[in-house]
Each structure stands twice: as C-alpha cells, then as structure tokens.
Amino acid sequence: MRGSGPRGAGRRRTQGRGGGGDTPRVPASLAGCYSAPLKGPLWTCLLLCAALRTLLASPSNEVNLLDSRTVLGDLGWIAFPKNGWEEIGEVDENYAPIHTYQVCKVMEQNQNNWLLTSWISNEGASRIFIELKFTLRDCNSLPGGLGTCKETFNMYYFESDDENGRNIKDNQYIKIDTIAADESFTELDLGDRVMKLNTEVRDVGPLSKKGFYLAFQDVGACIALVSVRVYYKKCPSVVRHLAVFPDTITGADSSQLLEVSGSCVNHSVTDDPPKMHCSAEGEWLVPIGKCMCKAGYEEKNGTCQVCRPGFFKASPHSQTCSKCPPHSYTHEEASTSCVCEKDYFRRESDPPTMACTRPPSAPRNAISNVNETSVFLEWIPPADTGGGKDVSYYILCKKCNSHAGVCEECGGHVRYLPQQIGLKNTSVMMADPLAHTNYTFEIEAVNGVSDLSPGTRQYVSVNVTTNQAAPSPVTNVKKGKIAKNSISLSWQEPDRPNGIILEYEIKYFEKDQETSYTIIKSKETTITAEGLKPASVYVFQIRARTAAGYGVFSRRFEFETTPVFGASNDQSQIPIIGVSVTVGVILLAVMIGFLLSGSCCECGCGRASSLCAVAHPSLIWRCGYSKAKQDPEEEKMHFHNGHIKLPGVRTYIDPHTYEDPTQAVHEFGKEIEASCITIERVIGAGEFGEVCSGRLKLPGKRELPVATKTLKVGYTEKQRRDFLSEASIMGQFDHPNIIHLEGVVTKSKPVMIVTEYMENGSLDTFLKKNDGQFTVIQLVGMLRGIAAGMKYLSDMGYVHRDLAARNILINSNLVCKVSDFGLSRVLEDDPEAAYTTRGGKIPIRWTAPEAIAFRKFTSASDVWSYGIVMWEVVSYGERPYWEMTNQDVIKAVEEGYRLPSPMDCPAALYQLMLDCWQKDRNSRPKFDDIVNMLDKLIRNPSSLKTLVNASSRVSTLLAEHGSLGSGAYRSVGEWLEATKMGRYTEIFMENGYSSMDAVAQVTLE
C-alpha cells in the first residue's frame, strides 16, 4: 500500500497492544515505576514493561531482516545530536537485552533529533516491511508544552550497496511516512498503570540495491521507540499435488503474482507441469498441473511410497496400489503387474487389472434333434468357465465311415446357423446334411486364452445318423429353344437327390421385377415358359422335391427372349392372333356357362358351394358341405352352422370343421418359402417343437424380426392337425393386441408357424424381472391392451379358455398381445382337477368355477380369467393363490372367497377384479365394458390414487384354506409364511388377528 513518502513507501497500520479495546494494565510489581518523575526511572520502567509485552513470534511467511527485540549485542545505531534520542539498555527476566530508544524534548522549539540504524541487507527482496512499536505522550497532558509539543515523528530510508556508508546527509534520505500514534497516554493512564502501545507497519519498494538504512526523525514529541522489525514476505516451501514448490520471495508490486514451477517428489513423474503463483501477501494461489506417482508407487501423505508384495500399480494414472487380480501374484516390491498362476493366462491385449483365466471345461449334456433337412444341437454351458465371461463355442463337424471307423471334416457342404465359430448361443442348426450319413459333432467351449493353453481341447461329442434328407440344389441348367415369347430349359438331377424326385418347382420373373414371379411345376427335367415379353431378360430358379420336402432353390440363371422381327413377320402373325382371340372368347363363354349351370359345386369351389345349394336345390346331394380356399378380400354372404352371416361381419371359423387342416391353414394363412426365413437362435420349447427367433425377408418387403414354431420330427397326424389348427385360428385375427401371423411353411420341412417377434417375451416373466418399475398408468395401459384384444376375440365369437399372463406377449413398446390359440383341452379326473394338454397341465386357478364344474366355456369365463390376469399384472407376476392346492382353490372360490388386493392396488382396479369374479357369469362385465372402464381411468389418473385399505385385504385372505387346525401352525406368522403371505403379518396384527383361533373366524362380512 502506497504511503505519503517517495519511491513507493507504503503505509500499514496494525492496532496492537494499547490500541482500541486491547489496553494492558501495568503489573502490580511494577507499580512503583509510575511514582517516579517523568525522566529517569519512570520512563525506563515504562519502556521495560512495553518491551516485555511485545516479544511475539513472526508468521511463517515473513522473514526478518532486523528485529531489535532479538539482537543480543549492541544495535550499533547512531543518534545525533547526542542529546536527542537516548538508548535505554535493560534485560528481561531471562537476562536478554532490551533495546529501547526514547526522546522527550517537548519544552524546546525546533527539535530535529535523528536516529540512524545500521546497514540492513534486503537478502534479494525487492519489497520490505517496517513494523514499529512505540508509545507517545498526549501533549495536552504535559503542562507548559502545548506550543512546542508534537505527537508525530518521521521515518526515512536510504538505499546503499555499502554497509559502511553511513555519512549521509539529511536531504539524501527518502521519506517513508509521518508516523502518528493511534493512542497516546496521559498522567491518568500512569496512575491506573495502563500502558498504550502503538503498532504501525509501512512497506517500501521496489528496492534496487543490496541493502538500506533507516532513519527516525523527532521534531518535538515525547516518544519511546520500543521495537523495530524489518522483514520481507515469502511464499513458504510447500508440497502440493506431489510437487515441491521452494521458498519464493514475493514481488515488488502489491498486486503481482509470481509464477513458480514445482519439481516432482521422488518416484513421481509429471502429468501436467506443476505450477503455482506466489501472491504479494506470501500466499500460494492458482495451482496448475500435478505430478503422479510412477508405476509401482502410490501416494501417501504427499510422498510416493512403494507398492507392497502382492500389490501392483500398472500406470501412473492409477491412484493406489491394487491387490493382484484373481489367479495372479507378485513377490516383489514396486510391481507394475502380477504374474499369472500355473495353467492360467492373460492375453496381451488384456489390461494388468484383469484376472488371469484358463480355458473353459467342455460343454455338458449335448443333445441332438435330426429331421430331413437339418440337425439341431443343444447343450449346457461348461461347469467351469475358466474365470471369464467371454465363453463362445466352436462346432467341428466330422463325417464318419461306420465300416472303416475313419472320420474326416465335413467341408463346405454343411451350413451352420447362425455360425460355426464364435457362437454365443448354446444351440446351433446344421443345414443340408447328407442323407444316411454318420456325423460326429464336436462342441468345444473356448475363451480368449484358449489359444495360449498348451493343454488338450475341451469338447463334448455328439454322434448323429441322418435319415432321408431334402434334395440338394439343382446346379446344371441349360437353355433350349428360345423364341420371342418363350424359353425352353433343361437340367440334371441334383447331385444329392436324397430320395426319389417327385417333382421340380420352377420360379421365374422378369429381371428387376422379383416381386412379380410365376411358379411352374414339372415332373420332368425340362420345361417351356411361355407368354414372355420379346427382347426381355428373365431369371429362372429351380428346386426339387422329395418325400422329405423341397430343397433349396438353385442359383439364378438369366436368359433373354428374342426380339420381334420385321413387318412381314408381324403380318404373318395376324392369323395366329385371330385364332388365339377366337379360342379365348370360346373358353370364356364355356366358363361362364359352367358357372351359371351350378357346376361349381362339383368342383368344390369353397364357400360359394353353399350358395349353389340355395340356387339349385337339386344339386345339394352332389355338393355336400365343403370348405375350400376363398379370396380373403372377397366378401360374400355364406352359411355357417345354420346361420346367415351378412357381408363385412367377421366370424371365427373352427378349423377342425375342415377335412384337411392344410386347406384351412392355406385359407387363413400365407405360405412362406423357407428360404425367406433366417433362424438366429432358439428361445424356447413349445408344445410341438422348438420356438426360435429369426428374420423374415419377403421379396419387395423390408426385413422383419419374427418368431417361428417348428413341428418336431416324428410327429403324428393328430399333432400335425393340431399344429396347423393353431395357425388357422391365428390367421383369422387382425388386431393390434392379438399376436400377428406372418405365414406358414408347409411345403418343406420342418413345418413352421411364423409370427411377429415380441422382444420382452411372456408378460408374467417380464413383470417378475421388472418388479415395481412401472407406474400405475403404465400397468393400466397394459391391462387395457389385453382387454381390447379379448374384446376383439369375443366379438368374433372366439373363446380363449386359457387366458393368463404367461400367454400374453409384450414387445419393446410395452404393447401386450394375446397369444396361444392352439391348445385342445380335456377335463380329467385327476386330484388337481386341472385341464391337461399335450404341453402340460393348465392350473385351474385361472378358470371360472362354472368351467371347472360344467365345462361351460364362454366369453364370461374368459372375463373371470381376465380378472386373474389383472391381479397378476398389479402384483408383478405373483402366482395366484400362492402355494394353495388346486382343491383348496376350488373350495375357497365356491365358498365365496376371492384373492386379496395386491399391495398398493388402486381401489378402482380391485373393484373391477371383484366384478370379473362374480359367481353368476351373467353379472360379470363384458370386455366392451372393461375397455370403457379402463379408458376412463386412464383419462382420469387421479381416480387411481385411492388405494385399497389394509382392513379390506384381511377379509379376502382365504384364511381357512391353509389347514388352520389348531395343531397345524403355532402362530399366525408361521401360517402366513407357510402360505407365502408373510408380508401380510403386520396387517393381521393391526386388525386384531393375533391368534389362529381369531384367523379361523374371518369371513367376508
């Protein structure tokens, strides 16, 4: 801070002892000093007291150049004139000298008393501070001195490189400031033994020479200079971010920041060059950069200490030493990595922090499934994965000669779906195996270190013998006669017919118009495609069919028709064209007459045959009741079960009324070529075979994700009918909340049903995995979708019979869709009273009581099941009635008990559940009513905030249906835990049901 003196003299005032509220009292032991006259002992005693009270330590960021309190010998200061400033030399209680100067020439005019210090080295500092501690007498307290007494004195300095250059004239000194006292003492202070000590600080800079002198000028004050301290400020040495910053003298300017570079401590390296800034006040500011302990060392208490054995640090960027990862060790200090144990490995690309692993053991329990066109393999992952998660599988196919006992690798004739190497799934399909061939498939589990292990391969073998397979592709196709409107082709049998060729299927289309193609079938190896455009390129593909099914199409062959010839040739075609037109007209007339005569009945023209019976009663005996293919876009009035259905009203048709299920499936479903489907992985097992996910790419359409159900090998005719019936049922439905049938594959093996793919799988499993993750509105949205789908089925006259959360599929957008339409159900007299299907038992806990007792399945019984589904959704997939037996469930429902409300269930939803569980089926709501109710709840979310209270849950908890005999359970809590209802214990206790006798009395009332 700049003062009034020249060359940057600064003024700082620090109110110390004697200033403000910090006025010390003179000790009683020194009270006698104040009774003496002003001169002599009194003044000396006073100065001693002041000196004894000011021996204080300096701050760590201040370096003293001079402190008169600590000088043991003579100060060497000079006073002139000699009768001016007077040195008082005393010692303290430790016999240390006390240097004090006083002057009190207040009665004489024109005082000019100087006190000069010895030469003071600045030690390289360009800015220094002077701290003065002094006392001053109040002029008003001195009788007779008002005209000559002053209450200030002056301080000067003079720079010099010479420590012996004290012969300085007064005018050569540079004034720093005029010093005034904040407080002065009076005679009263002496009487009260109070001493008022002033502290003033001034700064000077910038300095340019090695040292300087100070001078104090008295002009007529009564003053005692108790101590003089001269110092400079520095930023003290410090360790920050593992960098050492040395003592740094502050700059000359009070606002200057000096940038200082740090040096890294031992065993550390530079990350970003460490820097800090030293402020004028001696404080470190603005740290930049840092050092890091090098590899093998960690930071502790500002130093880098070595990593102990068993620990390592791979990089300076790591913070601390880490314990060696699993299956590795180190016995050295300062380790940067750990060594793998015997038989364990780490890849070069693996970081040192990764655990050492070993190759996995062999896969387990491999099984095979063989059909005419492929081999399916499935297995369980290895018991020992080697410690890693990167297990994949490699399939090695060997073709074996059973007589010679020799095996060779299969080569390229076998295709692996999805792949042979790097397989992540535990299943694979091999396509195009040879018929009647012995294969050995070696399934090897590998991971990232398998190549590093010198040990033997770990694999499981599966031996397979194929039966008759579909034919291999046709490879050799030759063109025959080519005209402007026709192309003749011939070809050879496939290299591997794998049986008797029944026929060939030829597919052709104009180039670049693949979506519009024509199919020709031929029992010979030659065909002629007619009706083609002149001068056009056509693409042909051929495949063969045996009893095992169709093979794959051949590669594409391109042939071009000849161009149209000249005018004469065109004229020659006129008679032919005329004949063709005439023949066409005749054929058209014959067909019209044929239809009008009612002969279509004899040809089995499908639903139109029932119209024939109306128009031509005499033909009824010939037509019978027949169902055949009809254009799905065509809407006609037809008979069904004795009722007339008007055009535009869709009604469910039971596919079992068809003599041939293939006819039904082709009427309601679309045939898809197997080559359009890519199987990716097995996702489950259905009633009739495996369920897989894959991709469907139809010509001219975008690729779709699909799910496929396959008909297992060795199926019976009844199984085939039931399998196709499910597709026939599904194909009749078109609703966003009903699973969509994409098509069927019936012309090749395996027979497949292709549906849309639902990413999240079954609803019950999905809810269990995401327990508590959805809002009430989201749950109601799911229920609304299910209800909308069931309303659609009800409107079509279809009764589902097995509505449960497990039969609801949910996609990635949380859209729920009703599925599982293919089960036939038979009521058996088993102790569980469950419906048995070929896929297993369906528990009766979802089934309405009238359906259990009288086999009355209606839309109303589906509504009961829907209420159970609501309970499953709100409880996030809990099992209805928990662990109660089916007989207990039947008894409880018949006696009027119902499932309790799930926890935190909105009252409106639980009331809807109870409505669905009305014993009288006519009292239950229709699905149309349910959809409307849920729509209202969604539009008014506040109506869902009212929850079912605790006491109402107790009344529906099926108390007496858990063997409540007094000896069965010792406490209510034990009974609730046994029935999987332990979370309701607190509710029972709060409502007074603390004993088994009390629980046994629970009724609906």
From Swiss-Prot:
Its main location: membrane. Residues 1-26 form the signal peptide. This is Ephrin type-A receptor 5. It holds the Pfam family EphA2_TM. Its EC number is 2.7.10.1. Residues 27-575 are extracellular. The lineage of its organism: Eukaryota, Metazoa, Chordata, Craniata, Vertebrata. It comes from the Eukaryota. It catalyses: L-tyrosyl-[protein] + ATP = O-phospho-L-tyrosyl-[protein] + ADP + H(+).
